[in-house]
Every structure is written in structure tokens, then in C-alpha cells.
Amino acid sequence: MAQFFKPQKRNKSVSKTLKAQVSALDHQARAVIRGEGSKKQTRFIMGALPGEVIQYKTTGKHSGTLERILEPSADRRDAPCKYYDQCGGCDFQHVAESYQLGHKQQVVEELFQKFGVFDSATESLPWQAPLVSEPTRYRRRVRLATRWLGKEQKLLIGFREAQSHQIVAVDDCLVADESLLQAVNRLYPVLNTSSIATKLGHLEAIHTNKPVILLRITDSLPKDALQALGSWQAEHNIDIWLQSENELTPLNNAGLPFDTSIDGDKLYFQPGDFLQVNGGINERMVQQAIDWLAPEKTQRVYDFFAGIGNFSIPLARRSKSVLAVEGVYRMAKQTLSNAEANGLNNLTSLSADLNDISASDLKNPADLWCLDPARPGAEGVMTLLKKLKPEQRPSRIVYVSCAPDTLARDLAIIAGLKSDKKSSDYRITKLCTVDMFPQTHHIETMVCLERAS
């Protein structure tokens, strides 16, 4: 017999305005509010600091938005960017850079403790001095959102608000190289037409050896639009590339290959390839990886998540051989091309799924490993390492991470208090934070591990 059910009405959460004192910051630089009301909810609110008394509005079970600072912290400063209160890009400008660095190191330490990488009651971590960046104008690549306002016949270009699809229109960005937004502003009159703007998803501006603007196109552009873009490109000497769902093409065969210098070598790339946003700090990070790994001409190196050869090329110049392993086939090919362009014949490039890599994918055991994964981390590589026979394991590893939670998870596999010491006996010998993303909560970390004797 058929049965009919009437869906129950959902209880709508009622937004409330409350007052509380901030107890701490979490690893995303959100203020932690504890013990609110009879249910003792914990809430997370962006923009406040430990010790501050704030007024905020509840927006969900564990979230809220900051309305007023009633009792400010002595660590608070006025944000230097005029768009800070609206833009969702930077989220940590309300404290000095020294505070940002201290907080980030504390986050790494707390996550290592949580995941069992070390026990703060019985040992300390071998922290080295952080690699410090210029606090502003450090980005050589920015991605901007776009939206065509049909009624106003106007194109919005800017960054999205925090946790929102709304766009904050900007004419400058304090953390970006000045040339990037200047190029976008000059191109704006050409983009601000319905024939282009209605087919524009987002745009990216990059500047290494020369500027380039990448337009993400959702549909084919008409002939007159392509002609207008081509004329602008020729007049301003700024290359334009068009990216559709399955294709990346230069407009009118624009320009020579783009390159960035690292350790005296040139790395060629295409717009759309992964490129560290902070060129200055990247050079220092690569040099520190070389110093920590200390490769010799008799040693083999594995470079996992190799990209276009950021670490592989400098390491190949100092070692017997390098196997560069990269998940994206196009970039794996580019790494090999970059090695050849720099006169290196001791680098092999392999495109492989790094989440499911096995010993059969690797040929000769390597003495040194370098890892630079994206935010999901390198769990597959760490699991492989744990399974290898002792004679197949590297003597030294440098792990570069942009996500401290997955870093802690991965290190716990091979170096944690609960790891199988018979199969994976590594200890942390050096670590530091890398100031890749000043004015934001994002944390870059470098860790050096060595096999215990």
C-alpha cells in the first residue's frame, strides 16, 4: 500500500547579535568564541584577535560575522588596503607582519602536536628562522573575477567577497605587482563591451619576463572582438592568451615563450601552468631546499610534484640524476624541455598519478627526495615511502607544504610518534615557515627529514 508523508518544516536559524571575548585564533586565522549560551557553542569569526571583546552576528551553527570591536587588542593595526573590509583576498592585514609570522609558526606546531608528529611535553621542534618576504607588491600573478551587468551595460572586474559570489571592483591590489592591475585597467575599455564581457569567465594577469593576460572564455568570440583585442595587444605590447574549456591558445600567435629565472637557469612555461605567486621568496625557498638536501654528484634525486622544474632543474645541476614526477602531463613535458633548454641531460620526467604511485613507477632508488604538493598533500607518496625496503629509502627528504594540516598528516605516517618505527624511522632535523603569502592566513612550510642511523 502506498504511503504518503508530509515533509516537516525546517527550523530556520534566527540570526542574533551577541557580545563575547575572543579566546584564540584557529589555523585559518579565524577568531574562536567559546562557551556561548546554554549549548556552549564554539563559533569562528574572521577579523578579530585573541583578547578582544567584540560584537558579532550569528550566521550559522558555528559561524558569525564581525560587527564591531568593543575592546581592541594592542596588536591590532589599521589595514593598509582600502578594499580590506570588502575584499575576500587578504584576511590578515589587521595585524603586523611579525604577528602573522608568529601565529603561523604556532599553527604548524599545534597541528604537529595534534597529529602526533611530536610531543611538546618531551621535545621541541628544530625551528629555523622564517624566510621573510616583502609584505606588499609580492604577487607576480593574480586571478580576477568578472561579471557583466546587463542593465548597466558595465563589466565588473575584481576579487570576490569572503564566502560570497559578489565581486568587489578594484583598480589596484596592494599585494600584487603594480604592473598587473595597470595592464588590466588599460585593457578594460576593450573588455567592457557585451561581445566580449558576456563570454568572459575570469581573467589572470601574470608578469615574469614580460606581461601576459589570460582570458577564460566561455564561448567563441566574434571576429570584431578578436580584432579589437589584437589591436590592443599590438599597441601595448602585452600578450593575450585565450583559454576555453579544452584549449589554451595565444591570440594571433602572440609572443615568445614566457620564462622565469631560478638559480641562474630559465624555466619556460605557458599561462595556465603552475607558478609560485611570490617570485622573490620562491628563489630563496629553492636555495634553502638545495642547502638542506645538500646533493652531491654521486647522488640520485626524486622530485615529486615537480611542476615545470622549479626544484628539479637546480637539483639536476648538482646531482648525478633527477627523476621529476608530475601529475599533469603537459607540465611533465615542459620540465623535460626546460632541462634540455638549460643544457642538462641527467633529468628524466615522468607523468604519474601521485595519489596512487608505486615502487614499480620508480627505477633506481634515490638518495634524496623533494616534495612540493598542492594543498591535498602527499599521502600517496608518504604511504609508498613507508612500504619501501630500507635500502630503497632516501637518506634525506625536503617537504615543501602550502597546507599545514595535510603536512602534519603526511609526516605522521613516516615520522610520527605512532608510526611503525621498523618500517619508517625519520626524524625532523629542520623546519621553517616561508612567508609566501603575507597579509593572508595561508601558511607555507619547509621541513627537512633524515633517516635515523
Segments predicted by a language model, with ranges:
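Extended interfacial segments that mediate partner engagement and assembly in macromolecular machines
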Residues: E67-D78, Q86-L200
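Structural signature of eukaryotic scaffold interfaces centered on beta-propeller domains
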Residues: I206-H207
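Short, solvent-exposed loop/turn segments that connect beta-strands within catalytic domains
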Residues: S38-K39, L149-L155, R393, D420-S424
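Rossmann-like S-adenosyl-L-methionine
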Residues: A2-K19, A24-Q28, S220-S453
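Terminal RNA-binding accessory module
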Residues: M1-Y83, S349
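Residue-level recognition of conserved beta-strand edge/terminus positions
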Residues: K57-T59, A145, E450
